[in-house]
């Protein structure tokens, strides 16, 4: 499984499909928007998992939003540990974090 992270609109989905050749049906986009969050085991079944970076930017005022952000961040950390490869996309440019 490949984990792809980056800011919203940074080109993560295009990178997964065009550069890496990941099939859309085997790619989970927008992990941060899934409710409830999928389990780690479920996510490991995808070819690629795409998530917005949630550790940067303005911290939400609402406790529930902060808790959600924390849960997404921790899940991404666990995914990164298990992923074969981790890429960060910034302005459409990939940076290999793990290979």
List each language-model region with its residue ranges:
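Glycine-rich P-loop/Walker A and Walker A-like loops and their local beta1-loop-alpha1 context
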Residues: 1-26
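Active-site donor-binding loop signature of nucleotide-sugar glycosyltransferases
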Residues: 6, 30, 91
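Conserved substrate/cofactor phosphate-moiety recognition/catalytic segment
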Residues: 19-39
């Amino acid at each position: 499984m490949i984990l792809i992270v980056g800011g919203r609109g940074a080109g993560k989905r295009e990178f997964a499909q065009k550069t890496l050749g990941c099939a859309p049906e085997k790619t989970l986009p927008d992990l941060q928007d899934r409710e409830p969050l999928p389990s780690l085991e479920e996510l490991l079944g995808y070819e690629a998992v795409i998530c917005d970076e949630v550790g940067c930017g303005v911290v939400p005022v609402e406790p529930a939003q902060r808790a959600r952000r924390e849960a997404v961040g921790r899940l991404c950390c666990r995914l990164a540990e298990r992923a074969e490869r981790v890429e960060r996309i910034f302005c459409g440019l990939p940076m290999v974090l793990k290979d």
